[in-house]
Amino acid sequence: CSFCAWGSATQSKVRQFPLEQVVEEIKYATARSANPQKLLYLADANFGMLKRDEDIARAIAECGEKNKFPKQTYVYFAKNTNERVIRVAELMKSVTSMSMSKQSVNESVLENIKRKNIPHQQYDNLSLECEKRGITTFSELIYGLPGETYESFVHGVIQTVRQKASVAMYPMLLIEGAENFTVEHRQEFDIKTKYRILPR
């Protein structure tokens, strides 16, 4: 997608740490964290895509139970949701919700940002399957995307809520390395920008 910068630093293959090391580091960090929000953030653009992700998810959930950390895990689940991704979300349902991101429901906006959402029927089926397994879900929508209007964004929120989904809304950010950060992209879509303070 034009707003995303995952992998832009190297454009190369990702190397995995050994599974045993990952699990031990999760156990170590969760047993010692002083993070008052008890939030764990996974920096994986497609969590649930690999078979080993089930073991990682199980370790995170077990640590949440044993160490009371994490209470919440922020996860970017694999975009092409399949049975494994649902199993991973089910393993972690005590410490996370499954994001079923849309960004927008407007077809021309999706084209502008080079994104294709899963078909509506597949989205509905996925939502029902998650509900059946006790997995809470939410959808993410981004306001300010190229071609999005106030009316089309509100329409997207209403449509998403009617699908019985919680909605998380974010502003479009320009991230260095993403296509929408380029001067050409800003000029093509007449993007006006402002700076904002990011609390740390």
Protein language model annotation of sequence segments:
Residues 5, 93, 134, 164-165:
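Residue-level detector of structured alpha->beta connecting loops
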Residues 18, 55-61, 114-118, 152-157, ...:
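Short secondary-structure boundary/capping segments
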Residues 23-138, 143-145:
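Conserved SAM/AdoMet-binding glycine-rich loop
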Residues 137, 142-145, 157-161, 167:
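Conserved catalytic-core segments centered on acid/base and nucleophilic motifs
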